[in-house]
Amino acid sequence: MVKLRLKRCGRKQPVYRIVAIDVRSRREGRDLRKVGFYDPINNQTYLNIPAILFFLEKGAQPTGTVYDILKKAGVSF
């Protein structure tokens, strides 16, 4: 099963990549594809909408935080 999950990047300031990753992998493990970017400090978000919709159509489940980010961006699924 695939999940859309946040993967932490950045050492001192939290910056996250939104990735499609196998549910059995670690948070920092190998991802299937990078589908977005989230910076909570500067409140910036970049989403690759076609890639996100592709994974959602294939049955991927977003985590709670990713679900909130997608809802805020207006992605309907």
UniProtKB/Swiss-Prot annotation:
Domain of life: Eukaryota
GO molecular function, one term: structural constituent of ribosome
SUPFAM superfamilies: Ribosomal protein S16
Keywords for this protein: Chloroplast, Plastid, Ribonucleoprotein, Ribosomal protein
UniProt keyword Ligase, yes or no: no
Gene Ontology biological process terms, A to Z: mitochondrial translation
Subcellular localization(s) per the UniProt record: Plastid, Chloroplast
Any one Gene Ontology cellular component term annotated for this protein: small ribosomal subunit
Plastid is among the record's keywords: yes
Entry-linked Gene3D superfamilies: 3.30.1320.10
PANTHER family, per the entry: 30S RIBOSOMAL PROTEIN S16 (PTHR12919), SMALL RIBOSOMAL SUBUNIT PROTEIN BS16M (PTHR12919:SF20)
NCBIfam families: S16
Family membership noted in the UniProt record: Belongs to the bacterial ribosomal protein bS16 family.
Protein name per UniProt: Small ribosomal subunit protein bS16c
Provenance organism: Eucalyptus globulus subsp. globulus (Tasmanian blue gum)
